[in-house]
Amino acid sequence: MKSKIVVDSSSNVYELPDVGFACVPLKILADEQEYVDTAEVDAPALAEKMRTYKGRTSTSCPNISDWMAAYEGADEVYVVTITGTLSGAYNAALLAGEEYEQSHEGARVFVLDSLSTGAESRLLVERLAALIKAGKPFDTVCEEIRAYHEHTHLLFALESLANLARNGRVKPAVAAVARMLGIRVIGQASDAGDLEVICKTRGEHGALERMVLEMKAHGLTNGRVHIDHCCNAAAAERLKHMVHAVFPEAKVEVGTCGALCSYYAEYGGLMVGYEDNEAPTV
């Protein structure tokens, strides 16, 4: 039986060694130009453009055919999508899974709504890979990734809310006030998959301190932490050191946002996925 992990590009995972893998890109539209979120797109250049761009922008998710093509060649497919509250990717992946099972005798497709995006999705993808490499059967993998998902979390710190406002995720007035006052917004992915604001801070140091406090409050001890940044490597490294100062056994990695996450996190933004202390092991 051939296994395959399939994700959309909001996970910032474009390749995964030693397992069957496919990444299905989301797209960003700006200034009549389409940016396909692959490893080749210049995400920092896109983020720089969005800093001054005043026109209309939008995003689009993979369709059923895109997902079907990604599933091809596998008998057991494990899918992780961006939260269904932000995108239709989850529903499209589900429908594609039903069609794939009908047209491929014996095939099985499991679709997990991450209820999140970015760095938390990457934790889920990496755990799926570990479960597959451990040789666990399909139903066990599905059961264990659901259990693991109960103990992963997403935090974000944003310097700008412009693109979230353009797409109806926050009120334009809130975005304007945040920009004028130099406020950084700290938020999280809720249990329902909504991106919700926790607090607002002034200055980068205060934002990073609050993120560490939130991780502590949600049970981080010696677990894994992924920090993805949009054109803000210095802040990401600083946060890594701050996390290690409080949680010296935590396994912290720093990465970069792809195009879709750069679009929403915007220039200077940070996205942090982490495990709490009750996360099960493989």
Where are these regions (language model features)?
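Class I S-adenosyl-L-methionine
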Residues: 33-102
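Structured loop/turn residues at beta-strand edges in well-structured enzyme cores
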Residues: 1, 19, 72-75
